[in-house]
Amino acid sequence: MKNPIYLDYAATTPVEFKVAKKMMNYLTIDGIFGNPASRSHKFGWEAEEVIDIARNEISELIGSDSREIVFTSGATEANNLAIKGIAFFHRKKGNHIITSKTEHKSVLDACRYLESVGFSVTYLTPKNNGIIDLNDLKKNINKNTILVSIMHVNNETGIIQDITNISKICRSHDIFFHVDATQSVGKIAINLKNLFVDLMSFSAHKIYGPKGIGGLYVRRKPRVRLSALSHGGGHERGMRAGTLPVHQIVGMGESFKLARKKINDDFIHLTNLRNDLWNGIKNIEEVYLNSDLKQGAPHILNVSFNYIEGESLIMALKDLAISSGSACTSSSLEPSYVLRALGIKDELAHSSIRFSIGRFTTKEEIQHTVKSVHKSIHRLRALSPLWEMFKSGVDLNSIEWDHT
């Protein structure tokens, strides 16, 4: 058993050995290293061919046409391209966008940027269970609404949104629907042929592929048109300029191929380990589940341990690689904006820990994690004056604290 135990798979995943080995064949003079845009010789033709193969593997996993895949540097760029691209191209049609308060920062910051240049954005507040209220969505649609952007699986809580019915609502109002599927692709079955989704973002490094490569699904029928964010060369059907990184795309294609083969076994494996973890810690006093075992993805478990700062617990659990939220915001001392949007009070949001498990997590590692959490919680609470006051029956909410 490795030490520390890696339980931050929602932040990134290790590259599968088979993926890494295959990527090595597309880097050196002995392999296929050509520029796929060089169509006058064999090196370019070979590079273009393997990219087409990768596109096919990606489309097979998500149920799309391979021609609907646009390569990007990752999900952050894909989210920006989808949101800004639709907004700028269709500005004459309308300037209103709908998203939610619990989206990834790459979506929220893109929307805030659009607000600064004249767009109007509605940020929906999910229900306390994290699910978007479909009636609330309908009420906020107006004649100027051009785009709805909702993530499939939340990166902090693992909550799964009902993108099937959201897509139907958007289609009935002739509104573009963008889905950030970074945490769901390869973990939950997706078939875009059965959904009215117009754009979908995803990344390779979340499903055992390389970092620095991702994609945006852009529907062809009915055709979705958007403005490019980068220009020069007309790559990716004019939507994303730049020489394609062949080795990364090959790695992405291979990781998606493996995900398609392993998705059912992975789902069972992750669900069992997540349930083992929760069953092992749920009887700790003042522990709160911020995820939903029925409406949540199998790889994420978000838990609050009252009267203990999440950062303190992370430091105490040196043998575990865990986080206090999204990898993009975990360095912030502010409580999770996602948990606050769900109505969770600051004290519990501050005490939250995200455990995220993966393909290589073992039952032995989960058993060790349960023991470590119990031990650290007991030790930290023994040092906590707040815990002592709580156990003495003091109503901490009635105390007026001096913040001077």
Swiss-Prot record:
InterPro entries: Aminotrans_V_dom, Aminotrans_V_PyrdxlP_BS, Cys_deSase_IscS, Cysteine_dSase, PyrdxlP-dep_Trfase, PyrdxlP-dep_Trfase_major, PyrdxlP-dep_Trfase_small. Keywords: 2Fe-2S, Cytoplasm, Iron, Iron-sulfur, Metal-binding, Pyridoxal phosphate, Transferase. Its EC number is 2.8.1.7. It holds the Pfam family Aminotran_5. The modification N6-(pyridoxal phosphate)lysine is found at residue 206. One of its GO terms (biological process) is [2Fe-2S] cluster assembly. It is an enzyme of class 2 (transferase). It catalyses: (sulfur carrier)-H + L-cysteine = (sulfur carrier)-SH + L-alanine. One of its GO terms (cellular component) is L-cysteine desulfurase complex. Pyridoxal 5'-phosphate binds at residues 75-76, 155, 183, 203-205, 243. One of its GO terms (molecular function) is 2 iron, 2 sulfur cluster binding. [2Fe-2S] cluster binds at residue 328. Its cofactor is pyridoxal 5'-phosphate. Pathway: Cofactor biosynthesis; iron-sulfur cluster biosynthesis. The active site is at residue 328. The keyword Cytoplasm applies. It is found in: Cytoplasm. PANTHER family: CYSTEINE DESULFURASE, CYSTEINE DESULFURYLASE FAMILY MEMBER. Belongs to the class-V pyridoxal-phosphate-dependent aminotransferase family. NifS/IscS subfamily. Master enzyme that delivers sulfur to a number of partners involved in Fe-S cluster assembly, tRNA modification or cofactor biosynthesis. Catalyzes the removal of elemental sulfur atoms from cysteine to produce alanine. Functions as a sulfur delivery protein for Fe-S cluster synthesis onto IscU, an Fe-S scaffold assembly protein, as well as other S acceptor proteins. Homodimer. Forms a heterotetramer with IscU, interacts with other sulfur acceptors. This is Cysteine desulfurase IscS. It comes from Buchnera aphidicola subsp. Schizaphis graminum (strain Sg). The gene is iscS.
